[in-house]
């Protein structure tokens, strides 16, 4: 509004123009925090220069902010009459009318303001609020967008946007915070500052800023979309889905909004809803490989293998260098790639150094080629060397992208072993949330955990969900308190938790996971293998939960994990020595937990499950505390959605083929054997 004020001139200007301008600027600065002082300053100027329009505007605004609305209205009506081309005067009169609940007059004045000055963002924003209150959602949406567009075109904000694009985030943050101090409700500023804080790694600060932007301008799609995407990275998936649904309702033909909503439906387990969206997009535009790929993922999850294969092949045909499409096809496990597929993948490999923009695609191409040659090696043992070579290249490339230090795992295990003693748990008997709903399945990836989950989910009292991140998110939040200096280390924090906080954390976990529960079954499975690191925390906050440790022969488990390209996480798995070291750390911690709380964890040995399925299933159900049901032996008939790498394998009866796959590659597994050490001789003993 300051630039608009500068255009307003009095009929006669006294000689001391500079001093008047300085006084006006001082009055404007006082307005936000001291409107009474601003009013006094404006009236001093008007005493010296009667009728000065800038001073009259400040007087009217100050009177409005002080709640003296009739006086403000009288001043501003006179100003508008004398300055009919002054957008700032019309806007201020509109705001005053709005404060007096005279909405029709307020809308008329604000419309006049933006007609006089289309780039008047503040007036557009005020108009949007009034129109929305009147039920004119279309008009409000237009005003939202016009206001954001006007604000975004201001030179200062454009310069800040350039700083953001160039990665000068601290500089941009300082500029945006200064701007926000002057314009605390400006949606464009709020959105850009939210983006900066997100890119700086502070999601906790970014989300409120973006929520404020959306609250101020509900039709601001860019702010709502960024908010939804950031929320989707954490536990607030339900809110993210609400925003995505609003985006798609406002713009039904927007493919990006449709993709966002579909991805969130997948997150909450609504595979059919996601399927409908992907198919709808492809009906309109079948030439989109990314959509075919996502469709394949959903078809695979719900067990439509033929449809998944077709979708993955369509994605690969449209984009032959798309490593994710080829790996997704290979990762079906039950599909064998043909020699023509091998030729197509080899042709897609780069002939020179791999750039960062292609690294993931190339890594996945190598993993897919490894799987293709491994399948050939069943009939042609010489293909094993090519398979291992491609797996090794893919792993090396993937490992180069990741930050993982095995020493951190060892340190965490040492701390857990020292903290979680029999005395520790005895002193906390009866603490935590007493609900017995969750069944945690822990272990390493590729250990048979999906098989255990599928068996349990075939029981009439147990619901299968997915790999839930919620316990890890709770642990991460506790770790953040350590990182902020509240405690010297995580064991100190855990030891300091009292009974009420333990109970609240357990209740929080149940509340977080509620979105994934689609039935009224009393128990549910949380199959997140890496929760073995948090078994002590689980016992503290949910002492009646069941913990199942799914374990497989170390060579079979680790080699299978090493040749798996994971969509996210599992950073320890891309080096044979590191995955062996990780397995040993896991065994060491679980053995210590067995000693601290004998019988608290039920262990399922994969090889024993294969050899004696009936006996092992009975023991598993006994550990969970539910009666035996025949359905659990026919788990492959369960059509529930399964999102893990073993999704196709658990849709068939137990088979023995996977038990010794590693033996064809034994020649190259020296680093893994060395890392595992004496565990190889002791398996399946827990220590």
Regions picked out by a protein language model, each given a short descriptive name:
Residues 32, 65, 99, 133, ...:
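Register position in tetratricopeptide repeats
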Residues 302, 307, 314-316, 465, ...:
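PAPS-dependent sulfotransferase catalytic domain
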Residues 48, 82, 116, 148-150, ...:
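Structural marker of alpha-solenoid helical repeat scaffolds
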């Amino acid at each position: 509004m300051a630039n608009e004020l500068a255009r307003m001139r009095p009929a006669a200007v006294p000689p001391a123009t500079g001093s008047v301008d300085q006084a006006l600027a001082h009055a404007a600065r006082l307005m936000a925090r001291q409107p009474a002082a601003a009013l006094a300053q404006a009236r001093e100027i008007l005493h010296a220069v009667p009728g000065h329009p800038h001073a009259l505007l400040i007087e009217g605004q100050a009177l409005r902010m002080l709640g003296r609305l009739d006086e403000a209205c009288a001043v501003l009506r006179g100003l508008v009459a004398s300055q009919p081309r002054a957008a700032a005067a019309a806007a201020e009169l509109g705001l005053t009318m709005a404060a007096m609940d005279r909405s029709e007059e307020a809308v008329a004045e604000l419309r006049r303001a933006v007609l006089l000055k289309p780039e008047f963002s503040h007036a557009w924003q005020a108009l949007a609020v009034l129109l929305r209150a009147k039920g004119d959602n279309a008009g409000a949406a237009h005003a939202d967008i016009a206001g954001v567009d006007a604000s975004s075109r201001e030179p200062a904000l454009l310069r800040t946007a350039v700083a953001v694009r160039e990665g000068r985030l601290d500089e941009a943050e300082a500029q945006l915070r200064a701007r926000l101090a002057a314009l605390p409700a400006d949606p464009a500023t709020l959105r850009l500052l939210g983006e900066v804080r997100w890119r700086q790694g502070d999601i906790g600060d970014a989300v409120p800023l973006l929520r404020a932007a959306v609250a101020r301008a509900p039709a601001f799609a860019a702010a709502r979309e960024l908010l939804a995407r950031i929320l989707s990275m954490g536990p607030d998936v339900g809110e993210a889905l609400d925003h995505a649904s609003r985006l798609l309702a406002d713009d039904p033909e927007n493919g990006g909004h449709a993709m966002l909503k579909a991805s969130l439906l997948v997150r909450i387990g609504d595979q059919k809803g996601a399927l409908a969206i992907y198919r709808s997009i492809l009906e309109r535009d079948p030439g989109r490989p990314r959509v075919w790929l996502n469709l394949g993922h959903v078809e695979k999850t719900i067990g439509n293998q033929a449809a998944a294969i077709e979708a993955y092949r369509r994605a690969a045909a449209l984009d032959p260098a798309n490593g994710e499409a080829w790996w997704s096809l290979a990762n079906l496990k039950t599909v064998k790639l043909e020699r023509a597929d091998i030729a197509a993948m080899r042709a897609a490999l780069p002939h020179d150094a791999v750039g960062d923009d292609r690294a993931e695609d190339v890594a996945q191409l190598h993993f897919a080629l490894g799987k293709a040659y491994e399948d050939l090696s069943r009939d042609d043992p010489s293909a094993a060397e090519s398979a291992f070579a491609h797996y090794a290249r893919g792993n090396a490339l993937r490992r180069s992208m990741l930050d993982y230090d095995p020493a951190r795992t060892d340190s965490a295990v040492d701390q857990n072993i020292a903290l979680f003693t029999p005395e520790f748990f005895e002193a906390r008997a009866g603490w935590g949330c007493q609900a017995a709903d969750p069944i945690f399945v822990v272990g390493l990836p590729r250990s048979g955990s999906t098989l255990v989950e599928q068996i349990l989910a075939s029981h009439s009292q147990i619901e299968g969900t997915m790999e839930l991140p919620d316990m890890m998110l709770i642990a991460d939040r506790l770790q953040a308190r350590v990182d902020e200096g509240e405690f010297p280390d995580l064991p100190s924090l855990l030891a300091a938790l009292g009974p009420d906080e333990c109970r609240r954390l357990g209740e929080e976990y149940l509340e977080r996971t509620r979105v994934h529960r689609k039935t009224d079954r009393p128990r549910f499975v949380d199959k997140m293998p890496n929760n073995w690191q948090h078994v002590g925390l689980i016992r503290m906050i949910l002492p009646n939960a069941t913990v199942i440790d799914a374990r497989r022969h170390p060579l079979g488990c680790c080699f299978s994990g090493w040749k798996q390209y994971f969509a996210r996480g599992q950073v320890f798995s891309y080096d044979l020595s590191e995955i062996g070291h990780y397995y040993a750390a896991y065994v060491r911690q679980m053995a210590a937990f067995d000693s601290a709380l004998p019988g608290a964890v039920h262990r399922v040995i994969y090889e024993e499950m294969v050899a004696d399925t009936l006996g092992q299933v009975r023991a598993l159900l006994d550990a969970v505390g539910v009666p035996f049901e025949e359905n659990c032996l026919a788990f492959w008939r369960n059509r529930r959605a399964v999102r893990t790498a073993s999704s196709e394998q658990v849709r068939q009866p137990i088979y023995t083929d996977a038990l010794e796959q590693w033996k064809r590659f034994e020649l190259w597994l020296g680093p893994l054997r060395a890392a595992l050490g004496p565990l190889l001789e002791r398996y399946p003993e827990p220590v």
